[in-house]
């Protein structure tokens, strides 16, 4: 059973998946930075400044009166939809970037396939040529 597990782990697909997960985790930090440091300030400038989704919430009890999400969570239950909006924006940006990368890779593959000329047919081996000549001579005698 241990040997089967080793074979399973050593397969290329499992290793590729592991590398993809690690790179994806690192890439998600880049997307978070793009959203929080580049996109959200632009959205804030368009909507009148100071626009921040993180403090958007609905109190689920009457005891919640705080203006910020962290303080409201200390007072009671809240429906923090602002964080969801931020995560949704992160996902959409990540999905768009992955779509563009896949499109770029597919275009590069198609270009390589288009530029690739078919290999010329290799000449037949010497023994095949000799056998063909013998066949032709036998046909001429008959």
Swiss-Prot record:
Listed InterPro entries: Mechanosensitive_channel_CS (IPR019823), MS_channel (IPR001185), MSC/AndL (IPR037673), MscL_channel (IPR036019)
Membrane topology classification: Multi-pass membrane protein
Bilayer-crossing regions: 14-34, 38-58, 82-102
A GO term for molecular function: mechanosensitive monoatomic ion channel activity
Domain of life: Bacteria
The family this protein is said to belong to: Belongs to the MscL family.
Name of the protein described by the UniProt record: Large-conductance mechanosensitive channel
Highest classification ranks of the organism: Bacteria, Pseudomonadati, Pseudomonadota, Alphaproteobacteria, Hyphomicrobiales
């Amino acid at each position: 059973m241990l040997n089967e597990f080793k074979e399973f782990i050593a397969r290329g697909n499992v290793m590729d998946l592991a590398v993809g997960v690690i790179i994806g985790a690192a890439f998600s930090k880049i997307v978070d930075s793009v959203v929080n440091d580049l996109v959200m300030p632009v959205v804030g400038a368009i909507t009148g400044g100071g626009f921040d989704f993180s403090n958007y919430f609905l109190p689920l009890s009457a005891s919640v009166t705080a203006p910020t999400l962290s303080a409201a969570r200390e007072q009671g239950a809240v429906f923090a939809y602002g964080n969801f909006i931020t995560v949704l924006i992160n996902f959409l940006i990540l999905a768009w970037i992955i779509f563009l990368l896949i499109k770029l890779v597919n275009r590069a593959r198609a270009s390589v396939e288009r530029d690739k000329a078919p290999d010329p047919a290799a000449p037949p081996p010497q023994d095949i040529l000799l056998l063909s000549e013998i066949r032709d001579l036998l046909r001429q005698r008959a």
